[in-house]
Regions:
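Long, amphipathic, Lys/Arg-enriched alpha-helical "connector/arm" segment
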Residues: 1, 33-67, 77-80, 88, ...
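N-terminal DNA-binding recognition helix of tyrosine site-specific recombinases/integrases
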Residues: 1-33, 80-83
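C-terminal catalytic core of tyrosine-transesterase DNA break-rejoin enzymes
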Residues: 6, 73-84, 150, 157, ...
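Hydrophobic (often cysteine-bearing) scaffold residues that line and stabilize catalytic clefts
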Residues: 7-14, 48, 67-68, 115, ...
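Short, charged phosphate-coordinating catalytic segments
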Residues: 20-27, 75-97, 184-188
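Conserved tyrosine-mediated DNA breakage-rejoining catalytic core shared by Y-recombinases
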Residues: 30-36, 51, 78, 86-128, ...
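Catalytic-site neighborhood detector that most strongly recognizes the C-terminal catalytic loop/helix
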Residues: 37-38, 46, 100-107, 120, ...
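Active-site/catalytic core of tyrosine-dependent DNA strand-transfer enzymes
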Residues: 46-53, 114-162, 172, 195
Length: 214
């Protein structure tokens, strides 16, 4: 039809302008205070220091599956999402950096996870046992890695049912690190949360050294 292409071009230009304006000025910040707070109850997590110390102690002394125990310990150093943890492969480890491919991330973006000396030492120990396997946390499960329910089931057995979850490690880390006044952007980057507005589009500083210390 006559004029259809011109209408399409104008429409695309208008939509493009709207997106550019949002990215530059993040208009959502102006209305967030008028919205009701939403509190998720799906991911229980610990926040008190003594409770966290007890959790880490129980994981250290867990007598069940070696891979499961190591996965939970590694999670406490990296606080990544469940899938990247469970499906972690040796080929993703590059020295002091863990390169999580985009297809394993909820955000569909690759994630760089700087590894602390403790995390590297843990991987070195695991490699002596599972170094010949594809997956770091190898399992006899049909896919070769830990199932989604395995880690949660172990936490329940240790007495944390309804108190702390696998995803709760992320909430726990965020709460503790913010209380310790670590840089907010570094925390969000480590959690693979994309900063909104200008920061999300133009922020190229990954704060890797800072995140390693954090």
């Amino acid at each position: 039809r006559r004029g259809t292409k011109e209408v399409a071009k104008r429409t695309r230009a208008i939509i493009g302008s709207i997106f550019k304006y949002h990215m530059l000025y993040d208009v959502s910040e102006r209305v967030k205070d008028s919205l009701e707070d939403f509190t998720s109850e799906n991911h229980p997590h610990l926040t008190e220091k003594e409770d966290i110390k007890e959790l880490l102690h129980k994981v250290d002394n867990y007598k069940g599956s070696y891979e499961t125990r190591m996965a939970l310990k590694f999670l406490s150093y990296t606080f990544v999402r469940s899938r990247p943890l469970r499906e972690a492969e040796w080929t993703e480890i590059d020295g002091d950096m863990w390169r999580v491919p985009a297809h394993k991330e909820k955000t569909n973006r690759p994630l760089l996870v700087p590894l602390s000396t403790q995390a590297q030492a843990l991987l070195k120990e695991i490699k002596e046992i599972n170094g010949n396997k594809k997956y770091i946390f190898n399992s006899n499960y049909r896919d070769g890695f830990l199932s989604e329910s395995t880690l949660g089931r172990i936490l329940t057995r240790m007495g944390y049912g309804g108190k702390h979850s696998v995803h709760g490690y992320r909430h726990m880390a965020s709460t503790c690190l913010n209380e310790l006044e670590y840089d907010g952007d570094a925390i969000e980057l480590q959690l693979s949360h994309a900063p909104v507005g200008v920061r999300g589009v133009y922020n190229k500083a990954k704060k890797l050294n800072y995140r390693t210390k954090m």
